């Protein structure tokens, strides 16, 4: 009923604007002035064959050269598809930042499993460069890590290449972290005040609080506990913090690692918004802000082949790292402003993890799409596989030119397992609020079991039967090709 009334109010507001042309013209002028005033800049590949210091044995593609030119102008999200050459792009960009003195010590953050390959490619492209690549075994243990960090801090490196695991263990100065958390506490208290909550300084939930205020107070309590734990932590003598390393440019590969942004929202009833705090994302944001303070908002670069995997919140999170000033210009520096400008919630009936159905509300409709794309492309350099000349010749074609869908019947055994999962979910639903909080992991566990059961019942329990109808067996049948027998 409430959602229907909300829709009626929105429709009445739109009708009022349409019936009063002078108001419509005034609002259109405000919107175009504040939100629709960007033209996507075109970047040209420089007319050089090789960058200064780079080997002549490697030729960069035009989109890589354009990416370097763009990165030298502003912080950028490189949404480049897998295999399009982000390694050479990041290496060249880091070396050019160093050459033109836009950065003194650029750092590239890569996956630990690929750091040796990345470092080898970087040294191949720039044979005479002073490149420090810290593999995982060089930073295992506190003493090894301290030695490695001292090497970064004391060396005059052209490039520093770090694995994600090591980078995540480098702490910021506790004084900076405390100040950063305090800023977040102030924002949350202001949000409680704007929602009409009494005693915004307190994290204690009042019976008169609205659902939104209750959720904000829970976030406030968590942040206060984090700040207190930081203050109670004993001082580490001789500790080397991120601020001591001299790094003044960050180039983060596989940026989806940091997409679980640590942000708060008043849209607590919207499904699909991952509002849970990620220590990695919180830590990354602190380091990003430190570098932006040193460089006037520059020198932050992210690369990922999957910038959006779940929700539009990921677009906002990536832009919050790289282009916070652009979000401010659009008036969407807070997530709720972004969501209200570019999305619309939709209430639908959806299956639960047990196969039953419930009504949920999600951000599924987009609005002001042209302006949103303009904002995104102002911050992001997007390259698809088909944008790379000759890519189609390197990739095998699909059979019949499209994916093949294989539909399987549910086995009787799978039906029994799913019914058992449903029963356990119904039992959890009947628990009291306190019991649910103590067993909050149950829905996620059941969801995982249901996903595994759909693939093969033995993934739920090894003693379950090997059913011919399972997806794993169907995959084997579809892919297995018997080796030709010699006569």
Show the residue positions of the predicted features.
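Residues at the beta-strand->loop junction immediately N-terminal to the Walker
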Residues: 79-80, 304
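Conserved helix-turn-beta segment of the N-terminal RecA-like "Helicase ATP-binding" lobe
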Residues: 113-140, 151-153, 322-326
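Walker B catalytic acidic pair
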Residues: 253-254
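Conserved SF1/SF2 helicase motif Ia
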Residues: 82, 89-120, 128-129, 294-298
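Inter-lobe coupling linker of SF2 helicases/translocases
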Residues: 145-192, 204, 211, 218-249, ...
